Amino acid sequence: MSFFADLPKDNKKCIKIGSPLALSLSDCLACSGCVSADEAGALSEDLSFVLDLSPQTSFVLSPQSKINIFNLYREDGMEYREFEAVLSSFLRSKFNIHRIVDTSYLRSKIYEETYREYMATNHLIVSACPGVVTYIERTAPYLIGYLSRVKSPQQMAFSLVKGSRTVSVMPCQDKKLENGRDGVKFDFILTTRGFCKALDSLGFRRPARASGKSLCSMEEAETTQWNIGTSSGGYAEFILGKHCVVETREIRNGIKEHLLDDGRTISQITGLENSINYFKSSKTKGPRHKMTEIFLCKNGCIGGPGQERVNDVEMDIREYDRNGREQPRIFYSSPGLEEKRVFREVKAKRVDLRVDW
């Protein structure tokens, strides 16, 4: 059942036609009322901000998107830190820039707030994936009480750029679902793919090498501050670092369980099928572990469906890990970001009772 009949879908086929059981993260899921709540918005990219370069503009960039763009555009021998300076300089040359913020700048703040929640509850579900949040709100409301209320990196970054025209660049379409809630209202939220189209239209096809002046002029907030752990944010790894891990078990591809010395377990789940199985099993048994970190994408955020896939996702993962080892420090500022996310059960509204399979 489609909630958005007769809306253009940019030539994308409905997942119900031909193979109703074939499901991927790039498909529209609005017909089941689970992950995507806005079919039209998820399948479109508004690039109109490139038509008017004069307003004061701020960019919020995810490190996953920046790594993907780096692997698409870099010249031979160019290092990631140099590419960051090239990208920032290019944006400043084209736009009236107020601020550029890499979302990793806020990770230490997020880790600390998440750890406080972890210590105060028996069961915690941690995710900056809006697909997870939307699925739970619409399909698994019995888990709402366990969701971490700490804002996602994109939501926290908005606090640093609001007041100017704001453009956010994220690795998946579902990050648009964070807009208009919890005090967050970006003017534009683009996938990495959409941002690359904007860069191409502005002439960013073969970036010039960065000068020493460009490298020195970058603000701390606009450079990637590498996290620990996975490409999805390192929530579990940060908490595991505060405990003694007795054993780590890989249950299957995309599911890991870490047994702590106090007898409690922290689990990490990635992938759509693994995530849905977890939601379903928790309905009857409840959350089994002290904490579960969960993301819908198979490889975490680095493998988001909004990434440009000229290169294999493994290339992005290798580059992310390599640069992570080169930049071990984490910086953050604390601009009054203690506001929490608010969750609510959402009743799926049906237009009619006709199911068009």
From Swiss-Prot:
The keyword Metal-binding applies. The lineage of its organism: Eukaryota, Fungi, Fungi incertae sedis, Microsporidia, Unikaryonidae. It comes from the Eukaryota. This is Cytosolic Fe-S cluster assembly factor NAR1. Keywords: 4Fe-4S, Iron, Iron-sulfur, Metal-binding. GO terms for biological process: iron-sulfur cluster assembly. It comes from Encephalitozoon cuniculi (strain GB-M1). [4Fe-4S] cluster 1 binds at C14, C28, C31, C34. [4Fe-4S] cluster 2 binds at C129, C172, C297, C301. Component of the cytosolic Fe/S protein assembly machinery. May play a role in the transfer of pre-assembled Fe/S clusters to target apoproteins. PANTHER family: NITRATE, FORMATE, IRON DEHYDROGENASE. GO terms for molecular function: 4 iron, 4 sulfur cluster binding; iron-sulfur cluster binding; metal ion binding. The keyword Signal does not apply. Gene3D superfamilies: 3.30.70.20, 3.40.50.1780, Fe-only Hydrogenase (Larger Subunit), Chain L, domain 3. Belongs to the NARF family.
